[in-house]
Amino acid sequence: MGAPAWNRIKSYNFPDHLIRHADNAARIDPYPFDPYADAQWRLRPGLASSSGVSFESVNYPGHYLRHSNYVVGLAANDGSSGFAADATFHRTAGLADGGWTSFRSHNFPDHYLRHANYVLRIDPLSASSSAVDRADATFHIGY
């Protein structure tokens, strides 16, 4: 039996929390929750750059994580270049742990996907950011 066609994305500093969508908001919540499919993602080639990645919802096909005013939510792909750029991220070595993963925004290259108060957003981060900020921006891709 092969690997599933979807991924779950776990928080580094809240390892029982998964990235999910709830009422179109992107957040991390402790597993288990219902519906479980809210935490299942298809990692697609980036909509704005094939070197990146876009997160497509399994239970809402055609809907992707995208940032708007630095807040990340689930939205239907409208086919625009702006949507594509907002929904594309580039994998990097984890800011808190190089064995994990961080996701840099395509159109704000100094901003990374991170959680703050359990809600996903993009913020400017670097190796000199606080340990908490770097941990908030570090994730594990699994099943």
Regions found by a protein language model. Name each.
Residues M1-A25, L43-V71, H90-Y118, H140-Y143:
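Extracellular glycan-recognition/adhesion modules and their associated mucin-like linkers
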Residues H21-R42, H67-F89, H115-A137:
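Short, tandemly repeated low-complexity microdomains enriched for cysteine and small residues
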